[in-house]
């Protein structure tokens, strides 16, 4: 779970909402690369797995 310092996250956007993001909504998502993200983008979060080398 990603922790936010107080003030980084609006009160109406709790951190739990981040877990609802699908890979398609990840800005680093590449639909033309077999539903994966090239490095280093795939290290930005658990929503977009690294593409195989």
UniProtKB/Swiss-Prot annotation:
Expressed by the venom duct. Disulfide bonds join 36-50, 37-48, 42-51. The mature sequence of Reg3.4 described in Franco et al., 2017 corresponds to the mature sequence of conotoxin reg3l (AC P0DQO8). The cysteine framework is III (CC-C-C-CC). One of its GO terms (cellular component) is extracellular region. Signal peptide: none annotated. It is found in: Secreted. The keyword Cell inner membrane does not apply. Its main location: secreted. Keywords: Cleavage on pair of basic residues, Disulfide bond, Secreted, Toxin. Belongs to the conotoxin M superfamily. The keyword Cytoplasm does not apply. Residues 1-34 form a propeptide. GO terms for molecular function: toxin activity. This is Reg12l.
């Amino acid at each position: 779970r990603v922790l936010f310092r107080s003030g980084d996250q609006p009160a109406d956007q709790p951190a739990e909402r981040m877990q609802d993001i699908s890979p398609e909504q990840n800005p680093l998502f590449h639909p033309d690369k077999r539903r994966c993200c090239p490095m280093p983008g795939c290290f930005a979060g658990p929503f977009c797995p690294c593409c195989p080398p």
